[in-house]
Amino acid sequence: MIASIYSFLDYLKMVKSASPHTLRNYCLDLNGLKIFLEERGNLAPSSPLQLATEKRKVSELPFSLFTKEHVRMYIAKLIENGKAKRTIKRCLSSIKSFAHYCVIQKILLENPAETIHGPRLPKELPSPMTYAQVEVLMATPDISKYHGLRDRCLMELFYSSGLRISEIVAVNKQDFDLSTHLIRIRGKGKKERIIPVTSNAIQWIQIYLNHPDRKRLEKDPQAIFLNRFGRRISTRSIDRSFQEYLRRSGLSGHITPHTIRHTIATHWLESGMDLKTIQALLGHSSLETTTVYTQVSVKLKKQTHQEAHPHA
């Protein structure tokens, strides 16, 4: 089974172009399943799963009684342990995807998780930032310092484009056409799209690329955004920096880099951009995913009306 899990993780990385964040989640979820089966005696004990190939220890451990009942029992254990509904749903999705891969590879005859449903999640609307909050956040990095300049540049690109954090991390120099203000993005499932970037963001990118410290540190000739070692920056590094800027800015609420994506989508809609264009810019495969921003926009208008109306 362990060899099959590693084969699945390699498939996600090489064929499906899964992001490092996605791979970590799959590894975490399947490691939990592995430990559960080991504790029940359905699987021989082994080392924890590793994403790095050189750290892997693979022995021939067969699937033993990996049935629908075992998947149900594992999900029940997660619920009993107080895991969040979203975590449980993600974990079940990981198991379903892995089992589906095993069926295709003729390792399993059927998918034991296929008909199992996870907990229902309440519909939560994204909470975008206000224009004022965006300005406060943008002003937080110290642009007189190299890393502050890089982080301001990142924020400008986030807000200009609505890119996912994994897409920004993957951006290369050759993906930018600075003369036409266009950027080529390879999104989920290797889907490619070309989107415009604001003049303001382009100016920040040019300043950042020409900074002497960046040129001195550069060890990855393709990547645009570098870490302190001159290598391509990671999503985790961006998350850490982002949380530090939030702390310094004094902004409250649950705000992440993905919040900026929700924010610009909402601001585009409020400025009159049509849903099909927003869908294309964000790289949504379904218009239904984009439609949620109409609900967010209506919610914000109601809130503003309540706060401003003298008879409210």
Swiss-Prot record:
GO terms for cellular component: cytoplasm. It comes from Chlamydia pneumoniae (Chlamydophila pneumoniae). Its main location: cytoplasm. SUPFAM superfamilies: DNA breaking-rejoining enzymes. Site-specific tyrosine recombinase, which acts by catalyzing the cutting and rejoining of the recombining DNA molecules. The XerC-XerD complex is essential to convert dimers of the bacterial chromosome into monomers to permit their segregation at cell division. It also contributes to the segregational stability of plasmids. Keywords: Cell cycle, Cell division, Chromosome partition, Cytoplasm, DNA integration, DNA recombination, DNA-binding. The active site is at residues 164, 188, 258, 261, 284, 293. It comes from the Bacteria. This is Tyrosine recombinase XerC. GO terms for biological process: cell division; chromosome segregation; DNA transposition. The keyword Cytoplasm applies. Residues 124-306 form the Tyr recombinase domain. It is found in: Cytoplasm. Forms a cyclic heterotetrameric complex composed of two molecules of XerC and two molecules of XerD. It holds the Pfam family Phage_integrase. PROSITE patterns: CB (PS51900), TYR_RECOMBINASE (PS51898).
